[in-house]
């Protein structure tokens, strides 16, 4: 029987991590864990409760009493915040523009990493985020780091938002993604960083299926070792 692997997929905002991770998880019959959705959920909770996003203690206290669940359904994974489906709401610009602010706090990241490690400890998981290969699953057998230009990522997010009927501005998206890159890369705790043993994939000129194929090939190579 093949050993169930842990697959860590990291990369900057809008690099296609979640889309690719879902495909890889489905092909491998693994559990998909969207860590970004967890940070988005606590960001939404903070906005709903009027918590100052720079107040680390207040955010930590809120997180400790907040239930965030990733629920598998026939329509894909849903995100529940205290038993309420917030799958769509966490993808709005209101949340997207603030999630990096919330995610920079040490106390928030420590609690999230603890929850994520608990979810991933049995293997057979595909987890995507900013610090999966470096902090959450440092022993993952397959580590991937996705790259794409800011312009390409803004284009993808623009098209994604248009399909959902959101009013979006391409130039504004470029600015927001560049700002998130800066926040994610420069934060003190678990910054966005490629793990030393991660395979780097530039997705700029690749389709989602091609990227997923490269990751599945990497997993196959590990399984054959």
From Swiss-Prot:
Known EC number: 2.7.4.25
One Pfam family here: Cytidylate_kin
GO cellular component term, pick one: cytosol
Sorted alphabetically, which InterPro entries does this protein's record hold?
Cytidylate_kin, Cytidylate_kinase_dom, P-loop_NTPase
* Binding positions (ATP): 11-19
Q: Which reaction does it catalyse?
A: CMP + ATP = CDP + ADP; dCMP + ATP = dCDP + ADP
Q: Which Gene3D superfamilies match?
A: P-loop containing nucleotide triphosphate hydrolases (3.40.50.300)
The protein's predominant localisation is cytoplasm
Q: Which family does it belong to?
A: Belongs to the cytidylate kinase family. Type 1 subfamily.
Q: What is this protein called?
A: Cytidylate kinase
Q: Which organism is it from?
A: Bacillus pumilus (strain SAFR-032)
Q: What is the lineage of its organism?
A: Bacteria, Bacillati, Bacillota, Bacilli, Bacillales
**Gene that produces this protein:** cmk
């Amino acid at each position: 029987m093949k050993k169930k692997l842990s697959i860590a997929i990291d990369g900057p905002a809008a690099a296609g991590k979640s889309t690719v991770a879902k495909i890889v998880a489905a092909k491998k019959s693994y559990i998909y864990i969207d860590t970004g959705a967890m940070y988005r959920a606590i960001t939404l909770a903070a906005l709903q409760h009027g918590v100052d996003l720079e107040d680390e203690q207040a955010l930590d206290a809120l997180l400790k009493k907040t239930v965030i669940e990733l629920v598998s359904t026939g329509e894909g994974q849903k995100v529940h915040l205290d038993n309420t489906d917030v799958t769509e709401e966490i993808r709005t610009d209101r949340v997207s523009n603030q999630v990096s602010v919330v995610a920079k706090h040490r106390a928030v990241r420590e609690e999230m990493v603890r929850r994520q490690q608990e979810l991933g400890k049995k293997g057979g998981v595909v987890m995507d985020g900013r610090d999966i290969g470096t902090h959450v699953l440092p022993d993952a057998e397959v580590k991937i780091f996705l790259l794409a230009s800011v312009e390409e990522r803004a284009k993808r997010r623009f098209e994604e938002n248009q399909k959902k009927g959101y009013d979006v501005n391409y130039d504004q998206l470029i600015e927001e993604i560049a700002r998130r890159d800066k926040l994610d890369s420069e934060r003190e705790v678990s910054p966005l960083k490629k793990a030393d043993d991660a395979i780097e994939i530039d997705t700029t000129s690749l389709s989602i299926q091609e990227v997923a194929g490269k990751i599945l090939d990497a997993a196959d190579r590990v399984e054959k070792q």
